[in-house]
Every structure is written in structure tokens, then in C-alpha cells.
């Protein structure tokens, strides 16, 4: 399974939290444009670490969890993988990430 940040989404990691937003809101819109815009979300420090593993290019969940296991020491690999997949899938469902 692969994940990536959508092309029209911006993610920033700050000290203590993360910020993800849909940049398409900042462009000109036609009057008949009925698309749903995602808005913005703040995530915790651990969520920001997870999202910072992604970019605009697809990345394997196993590669991501491999790196995360070096940061979240003491967490079982399968537990970390399950938590990461659940976390990423929330953002897929909300439209911030792509999955394939």
C-alpha cells in the first residue's frame, strides 16, 4: 500500500504540532464551482511526525513504518503499522492524502 500528499495540499511540521491545508482554496474560483474544499487541520506532534514521512510522491507504508520505528522506539512494528495506516486513512477519507 502506498500513500502520498495530494498535489493541492500543503503540510508543515512545526515544533509541537503539524498543519495540513487544501491550497486550492487560495485560487480564483468560478461562480459555478461546486467542489468541496477541505479546509485545514492541526495534528499532534506524533501525527506531524507521521505525516512528515510523506511527500507529493507515493511512499510504501512499509518504508514509512520502517523509519517511524526508529523514532517511536519500544512500539511493536505491527502496532505502529496499524496505527499509521488508521491515521493515514483518516486523511485519505477527508481528501488530504491519496492511497494506492
Regions of interest found by a model, annotated:
Residues 36-100:
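Long, charge-rich, low-complexity alpha-helical segments
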Residues 1-53, 93, 100:
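Acidic, low-complexity/disordered tracts enriched in E/D and polar residues
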Amino acid at each position: 500500500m502506498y500513500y502520498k500528499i495530494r498535489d493541492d495540499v500543503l503540510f508543515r511540521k512545526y515544533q509541537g504540532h503539524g498543519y495540513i491545508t487544501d491550497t486550492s482554496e487560495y485560487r480564483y474560483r468560478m461562480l459555478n464551482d461546486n467542489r468541496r474544499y477541505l479546509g485545514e487541520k492541526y495534528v499532534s506532534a506524533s501525527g506531524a511526525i507521521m505525516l512528515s514521512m510523506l511527500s507529493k510522491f507515493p511512499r510504501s507504508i512499509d518504508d514509512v513504518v520502517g523509519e517511524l520505528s526508529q523514532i517511536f522506539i519500544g512500539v511493536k512494528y505491527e502496532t505502529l503499522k496499524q496505527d499509521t495506516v488508521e491515521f493515514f486513512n483518516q486523511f485519505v477519507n477527508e481528501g488530504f492524502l491519496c492511497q494506492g
